[in-house]
Amino acid sequence: MTRDEFDAYCKSLTATTNVVQWGGSSVWKVGGKIFTICSHWGPVDRDCISFKCTDHSYQVLCELPGVVPAPYLARAKWVQVQSNETLTDDDIKSYIEEAHAIIAAKLTKKQQRDLGLLPA
């Protein structure tokens, strides 16, 4: 998945905002809280996608080649996909959507309603 494809997909999710920070990283948020990042963090010389995941997904994904605990964020169960061969674009989109849902669920009910994540 290219950075442009990553940004386009994240933009399509409900109530998302984007900021470029931390050395040019594309940081996507819902309700002001980060759920995924496309960055050059780590040992590979290309953009890598990092996202929040469930405890189970974290364990499973970290066993795959090309997926590592995300730099600076691993303690919060974030992974970084460093290889395009490990997961398909559809897999990555699914995990990004799950990350969006995980972070959105941590917002207050009022915030969720205000952002259109819950019925009014």
Segments predicted by a language model, with ranges:
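Charge-dense, helix-prone N-terminal extensions
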Residues: 1-120
